[in-house]
């Protein structure tokens, strides 16, 4: 698992658990429920495999995956979500909802969950083909979400706009911008995919 950040997956697990708490309160459809459970279970399985299961465990480079994801990811997003939720219920005169608060938190956290992975790749500089493709498609799905919002806003008369979702979606896509540039540059030129170091960028 060289080049893969388990900390990014740990952040995504927190995202899915806090976002899908409505599994216990609201039933939408069997498909919806199964997919939510699948997201949580598959992400937890990936984390367990990388951290504890041999021989995968020995290929995980802890020394490169050192971003303080709880201090600089979870904590700031929790504070921001609380402030946003309080402002929202005050302006709309709604009651406090822990499920809504955690949903907002999950949106903020998802937007920066890729940071540990991008930092690991920059430290390695040369990115393996499989790892590069994996991260590219993780970012591409979020970029496609933006196109989906534009489409639905145009064609659905009663589409509900959510500016926190918009902001976080754009932010997440922008975090990938540098990676996308070098990934596509390597693919079009047929060269080896590598990312510049911070020293090179100056």
Question: Where is each model-derived feature located?
Answer:
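Alpha-helical membrane-protein topology signature
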Residues: 1-202
């Amino acid at each position: 698992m060289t080049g893969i950040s388990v900390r990014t997956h740990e952040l995504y697990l927190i995202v899915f658990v806090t976002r899908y708490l409505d599994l216990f309160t609201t039933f939408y459809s069997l498909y919806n429920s199964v997919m939510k459970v699948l997201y949580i279970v598959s992400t937890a399985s990936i984390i367990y495999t990388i951290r504890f299961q041999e021989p995968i465990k020995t290929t995980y480079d802890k020394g490169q995956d050192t971003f303080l994801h709880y201090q600089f990811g979870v904590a700031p997003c929790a504070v921001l979500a609380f402030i946003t939720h309080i402002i929202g219920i005050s302006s709309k005169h709604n009651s406090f909802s822990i499920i809504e608060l955690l949903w907002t938190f999950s949106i903020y956290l998802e937007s920066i969950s890729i940071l540990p992975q991008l930092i690991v790749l920059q430290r390695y500089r040369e990115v393996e083909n499989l790892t590069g493709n994996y991260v590219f498609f993780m970012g591409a799905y979020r970029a496609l979400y933006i196109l989906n919002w534009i489409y639905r806003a145009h064609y659905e008369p009663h589409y509900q706009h959510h500016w926190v979702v918009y902001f976080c979606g754009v932010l997440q896509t922008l975090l990938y911008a540098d990676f996308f540039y070098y990934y596509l540059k390597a693919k079009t030129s047929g060269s080896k995919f590598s990312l510049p170091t911070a020293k090179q960028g100056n």
